[in-house]
Amino acid sequence: MSIAAGLARPPRCVLVNVLTGEAMECLFNPTQLVEKLQVNWNRLAVPGLSHQVLQFQGTSNRQLAGVEFYLDAFFATQQADASNIMAFRGFLRALTVPPAGTEGVLATAPPRVLVLWPGLLTVECVVASVEFHYRQLAVDGRVLVYTATVTFEEVLDTRVTSEQLRQEVP
């Protein structure tokens, strides 16, 4: 292994606004990921039967719950792109409201986001919630360190079968 390869940063999580194509690479990969699904069943009560009959209703949308993004202004200035950490905040906030000029019920929704997690998953989602915690502030009030905790919910436009999911390999 060369020294350059040893010093190279690993691939990072990328968020892409599906509507505009704008991509935002995470400063750090979140340290953990919770992928949540729920299988929904109707519970049918049959008189005289000792148990409830379960009837499959559907599966909830996959959620990536509580994904925590850590942003540090000092670390960001050391990077080649020298990004402003508040740009990530603006990017996330823009994913929570409809874009300008949208009309009609279907179009009046926040844009979808593509979550690309290298070697693990690629999911088209919407932002279900976002919470910002400002951890360190400068004397002049600038934010130096903050976390953004985001819950993403998958959006599916087609029916998914168990065979398709079984073949899914990152």
Name every feature range the model reports, one short phrase each.
Residues 1-170:
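Acidic, Ser/Thr- and Gly-enriched intrinsically disordered low-complexity segments
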